[in-house]
């Protein structure tokens, strides 16, 4: 089976993480869409493993958590009338927990917006931290049980509850209602009110929408398969944490957090992809039967 050179595959992965759609990459790089999809699936699986292995023992002071909306195949409100909609069509939520100082994505989760998803995120977050932290979230009620279950009393936790004005008219439904104020609510421990904020994680939500085409609103670049959506988030997370230079830090978030000493590259990821998928070993050729002439 033919395989693209490593440099070509690395460029495809980079373009996926810089906001290009799969079909746009296929056109610009003169490859098939299936080739781009296979590169995403192979690398995404490895990136998820690398995140689990490398983002451990994180020493953070302040963690901010939030969830960002996207959809698979069609939006939730149109699932009932959509043609040939798969069983997992509808809204998808990506949960993230970010170190406010190093900007490291400590934990992420692709799922729904249920209490169970919040529990899984917080359990994962707790397993990667080495010390007591201050956690800030929005007012989503699912966080209350999740933080309590994962951290017990060993956490300083507060919620930032935003107060909004009237909802925009249907014509302006993509314009959010005006935020008229915020309320900081202490939930557990002794959180420092000065650092009770979700500003960094909300800013990162915009970064995610800019870097992953399937998160961009009002386009047809949305996900068509939940599995590929999860692979893209895993690919982006490793890219953001270990490969991409953060514009303010002048290094990667992983380096700032002290869990990496140098930059990684997609060549490193592809080396693991190739190691996990070695080429088939051909058997010996021959012997052949002697050809009998007419």
List each language-model region with its residue ranges.
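Residue-level recognition of single "structural anchor" positions
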Residues: 1-294
